[in-house]
Amino acid sequence: MTGRDALSDGRARSRALVPGGPSTGSRPRGFAITDLLGLEAELPAPEGPGPGSGCEGPAAAPRAGPGLGGSCPARGALPLGLGLLCGFGAQPPAAARAPCLLLADVPFLPPEGPEPLAPRFPGRPPPSAARQKRSESVSTSDEDSPSEDRSDRKASPAPSKRKKRRHRTVFTAHQLEELEKAFSEAHYPDVYAREMLAMKTELPEDRIQVWFQNRRAKWRKREKRWGGSSVMAEYGLYGAMVRHCIPLPDSVLGSGEGGLLGSCAPWLLGMHKKSAGTIRKAESEEKLAGLWGSDHLKEGSSPHQAGPQRGLEEGSPVSGVEDVVIDLSSSTRQETDRAQQGVGAQGRPDSEGLEGLQPGKEGAL
């Protein structure tokens, strides 16, 4: 038989001898050190309180003394912690004891301190101080958050504010006249033109720029008819006419009878007239080049044949500029012929050489 078995047998005998104690089979085994080691057999069961005693201090104090302090034989030999556990293990179950436990009965705790002592480490603050700091941080964060919310509320309405509307500029009749005149000259004036216009009208340059933007928008909305929407539309139509050899519409030609300003497409009509003049000029240059080549081929012809030819040219429907050019070319040819004849006379005066050589030349021809 081992020592543990002997202890368990002794515990059973002691329970049987104690009057009014609980039965051995009905009491469950606890998980305390005394229950696990079998030390409860050597502890006598304390007397239970009366039915009407309750939790009175004077009645409970003398009862707790022998249960915790003097009845444990191994109390002096065991360390401090094991002695405390031994005293707690010797107590009966909660059903047989008083309904409340007085912390003042424990000899290791002061009567005033309800909280158990916690081990303190040198580098770690006590739990009460940590809880206090945590509560302070929570309170400070709660106090700071409304101020941040208030600052956000103050900052958020600032962008949502609508900007003040700028006052409308009232233009005088003189200013409008100058602006309309500049708009008729150029729809997109540069900075220099706007600055000059600002000096004339005594208006700021940015106001003039805004006026031109509004005026261009108004002009685009108003000019909806064909050929009058914009200069770029007229330019595109003119390019299509040139590429595909499309004649100018009769409506544009008819509107230009009273002048370019009265036409529905003044720029297009002006470009058409310029192109027609360029074509006419090219044809006249070709005629002049042909006449000049024929004159060089007829080096041996007499100057008398130039007269009928000039008469025919005068009778032809050619412009006055072409007649002047032809006359200049014939006179130049006559002068060159006379110079050649003067060199071949060999000592004769120019007039006699010309008179003597003229009949011979005619006879040879």
UniProtKB/Swiss-Prot annotation:
SMART domains: HOX. It is found in: Nucleus. Residues 164-223 bind DNA. Residues 1-12 have a biased composition (Basic and acidic residues). Pfam families: Homeodomain. It comes from the Eukaryota. A motif (Octapeptide motif) lies at residues 31-38. Residues 160-169 have a biased composition (Basic residues). Residues 224-277 form the CVC domain. A motif (Nuclear localization signal) lies at residues 161-166. Its main location: nucleus. Residues 114-128 have a biased composition (Pro residues). Gene3D superfamilies: Homeodomain-like. Expressed in a subset of cells in the inner nuclear layer of the retina. Binds to the 37-bp core of the locus control region (LCR) of the red/green visual pigment gene cluster. May regulate the activity of the LCR and the cone opsin genes at earlier stages of development. Dispensable in early retinal development. This is Visual system homeobox 1. It comes from Bos taurus (Bovine). The gene is VSX1.
